[in-house]
A protein has these predicted regions:
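Positively charged n-region of N-terminal signal peptides that target proteins for export
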Residues: 1-4
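Bacterial N-terminal signal peptides
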Residues: 6-17
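Structural preference for beta-rich elements and adjacent junctions enriched in aromatics
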Residues: 21-423, 428-432, 445
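Repeat-solenoid scaffold signature
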Residues: 194-197, 204, 285-315, 459-506
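Outer-membrane beta-barrel translocator/channel fold
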Residues: 314-334, 341-342, 346-351, 434-449, ...
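Extended hydrophobic/aromatic segments used for targeting, binding, or gating
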Residues: 417-467
Length: 506
C-alpha cells in the first residue's frame, strides 16, 4: 500500500492599490448589486457578476471571421474585461468586444480582439485540439457556456488567432474536464490592422438545454489571453487561480427566447465490406459488417446512448508513449460513445480539489472506460450496450451496461455501472458508485466488483473538504483492496493551507 500526507501553508501579502492606478469602466449591465464598480478594485472576486444580452438575428451573419454583418451591429457589446494576471483587478490593457446573436438553427458568438501590436501573436500549432490551447502558451479567445445555469458544468471552446480551436466539457465547477468531447462548432478568424476577430457558430443540436417557451438564462464567461505580455482577462472577473470554466463565478446571458428543441433523436448507422483475393488465400474472401449508434434525449438533462456492433474505426489512435515504470500508462478516452457527459462517471482524485497536493485522476480512478472494448491496446468487439447520463434537478446520474464479444485469451464479458451524486448545497455533493465486471456464461479471473462513496463539500466559503472510500472484490486477489482519501483546504487571498491523507491498497 502507499500513503501520503501533505501540509502546505502559504501566506500572501496584499499590496495596497496606488492612487490613480485604476480607472473606472464604462457602465455595463449587471445583476443588482451594490458597489464596488467594475475596474476599481484589486480583488476580482469582489466585482458584481455581469449580465449580458443576446438578440435574435433576422438575417444570420455570414461565417467569415469578419464582424461586418448587420446582425453584429445590432447586438449589445460585452466588454470591460478585467485582468486576473499580471495585475489582478485592473482593466485589460487590450480591449475586447464580444456580441452574441442567435436564430432558429444556431447560436453565434462574435469577438473583436483589439491589439496595439497586431501580428505579434504567439501560436504554438494550427492543429485541432492542440494541448497548448488550454495552457498559457498561446494567444486565446475562450468561451464557456453553462446551458442549464447550474453553475457547475459547461461547454468550453478555446480559439487561437489562426482559427485552431480546442473544445470540451467541464464538470463540477471545474473539478473535472474532458477534452475528448468534440462540439459541432464552426470557427472562423480574420486579421485586421487593429487586432483580430473571430466568429463561432454552434448548432442548437450540439447543445443540451431546456427547450422551453419564454426566456432562458445561461451561465457565461469569456477569456482573452495576450501571450506576449502574459495577460489573462475575463468578462466575469476571476482570481488568478481560477480557470475560465469556474462557472460558480461566471456571468449570466439572457435574451434567449423560444429556443428550438435540441433534437431528441440522433442515429448513426454504418456498413462495412471487405474483399481479399490472392493465390496465397486460395481464392476470394468477402466479409461484411453493419452496426448502429443512437442518441436519444430522455429529458433536457438526461441522454440515452445505445450501440449495436460498435465501430470505433474512426477514433484517433493514441500517441505512442514509453513506459519505464511498473504502473500502467493512462490514456484519455477518445471514443464518442464514452466521451459525452463523462463527468457523470467520474470517481477518484480530482485535480482542482487537490490544488498543490500532487493528485489527479491518473493517481486513482475507480472507473476507466478504456477497460471496455480494449485489451492491451487492441480492440475487443462490443456486441451491444447502452448508457443513461446527465442531471435531474439536484441529482447527477450515470448508468452503463455493455456486452463485449469473445476474443483470443478473453471470454465474452458484461460491464455494468451505476453512479449517483446528490448536490446537497451549492458547490457540495455526496455520491456513490458500483461497478460489476463478469464473464458471460461462466466464471473467469477477470470477474470483479468495485464500489465506493465520496463527498466534496464547500464549507464557510474558503474551506473545502473532499473524501472518498472505495473497495474492490476481485476473484483470486489477496491483500488490501481498498482506497481512501481525506483532504481539506482553506484558500483565500491571504491564506492557502492544505492537508491531504490518502491510502491506496495493493
Amino acid at each position: 500500500m502507499k500513503s501520503a500526507v501533505t501540509l502546505l501553508v502559504c501566506v500572501l501579502a496584499l499590496a495596497p492599490a496606488l492612487p490613480g492606478a485604476r480607472r473606472k469602466l464604462s457602465a455595463q449591465e449587471t445583476e443588482p448589486a451594490p458597489s464596488p464598480v467594475r475596474g476599481s478594485l484589486d480583488d476580482p472576486e469582489a466585482y458584481p457578476r455581469p449580465t449580458g444580452h443576446a438578440v435574435r438575428a433576422d438575417l444570420p451573419p455570414v461565417l467569415d471571421g469578419h464582424l461586418d454583418d448587420p446582425a453584429w451591429s445590432a447586438a449589445p457589446v460585452f466588454s470591460d474585461f478585467v485582468q486576473s494576471q499580471p495585475d489582478p483587478g485592473a482593466l485589460a490593457t487590450e480591449r475586447t468586444e464580444v456580441r452574441v446573436v442567435y436564430d432558429d438553427e444556431y447560436l453565434y458568438v462574435g469577438a473583436m480582439l483589439y491589439d496595439s501590436h497586431p501580428g505579434e501573436y504567439v501560436v504554438q500549432s494550427l492543429e485541432r485540439d492542440f494541448p497548448s490551447l488550454s495552457t498559457r502558451d498561446a494567444d486565446i479567445f475562450g468561451i464557456s457556456l453553462d446551458t442549464f445555469l447550474d453553475r457547475q458544468n459547461s461547454y468550453l471552446i478555446l480559439i487561437n488567432p489562426y482559427g485552431a480551436y480546442r473544445d470540451g466539457q467541464t464538470f463540477d465547477d471545474s473539478r473535472n474536464q474532458d477534452f475528448g468531447f468534440d462540439a459541432p462548432a464552426e470557427v472562423r478568424t480574420a486579421f485586421r490592422d487593429d487586432g483580430w476577430s473571430v466568429e463561432v457558430r454552434i448548432p442548437w443540436s450540439g447543445l443540451r438545454y431546456v427547450a422551453a417557451e419564454g426566456e432562458q438564462r445561461w451561465g457565461l464567461n469569456f477569456l482573452r489571453r495576450v501571450r506576449r505580455i502574459n495577460e489573462d482577462s475575463y468578462w466575469a472577473p476571476l482570481e488568478r487561480r481560477d480557470p475560465l470554466h469556474r462557472m460558480s463565478k461566471a456571468g449570466t446571458l439572457d435574451g434567449l427566447v423560444d429556443l428550438p428543441s435540441a433534437g431528441a433523436v440522433w442515429v448513426k448507422p454504418y456498413a462495412l465490406t471487405a474483399t481479399e483475393d490472392g493465390s496465397l488465400l486460395g481464392g476470394r474472401d468477402t466479409s461484411a459488417d453493419v452496426g448502429l449508434d443512437m442518441k436519444y434525449g430522455l429529458t433536457p438533462g438526461l441522454t440515452l446512448d445505445l450501440t449495436v456492433n460498435t465501430d470505433f474505426s474512426q477514433v484517433e489512435v493514441d500517441q505512442e508513449r514509453v513506459n519505464l515504470t511498473r504502473f500502467p500508462l493512462f490514456f484519455p478516452e477518445q471514443r464518442d460513445f464514452f466521451v459525452e457527459n463523462s463527468g457523470s462517471f467520474t470517481f477518484g482524485d480530482q485535480t482542482e480539489r487537490n490544488y498543490r497536493m500532487g493528485a489527479s485522476l491518473r493517481d486513482f480512478s475507480l472507473f476507466n472506460s478504456r477497460a471496455i472494448g480494449l485489451l492491451d491496446g487492441e480492440p475487443v468487439p462490443i456486441v451491444a450496450g447502452g448508457r443513461v447520463s446527465g442531471r435531474m434537478g439536484s441529482w447527477e446520474l450515470g448508468v452503463l451496461d455493455m456486452r463485449t464479444g469473445r476474443e483470443a485469451g478473453l471470454p465474452a464479458e458484461n460491464f455494468a455501472l451505476a453512479r449517483v451524486r446528490k448536490e446537497v448545497a451549492p458547490g457540495s455533493d455526496v455520491g456513490a458508485m458500483f461497478i460489476d465486471r463478469s464473464a458471460v456464461g461462466g466464471t473467469a479471473s477477470t470477474d470483479n466488483r468495485s464500489y465506493g462513496v465520496d463527498a466534496n463539500l464547500s464549507l464557510w466559503g474558503p474551506l473545502r473538504v473532499n473524501a472518498y472510500w472505495a473497495a474492490t472484490d476481485s476473484r483470486g486477489a489477496t491483500g488490501d483492496q481498498t482506497a481512501a482519501r481525506f483532504g481539506a483546504a482553506y484558500r483565500d487571498r491571504r491564506w492557502n493551507v492544505s492537508a491531504l491523507w490518502r491510502r491506496i491498497g495493493d
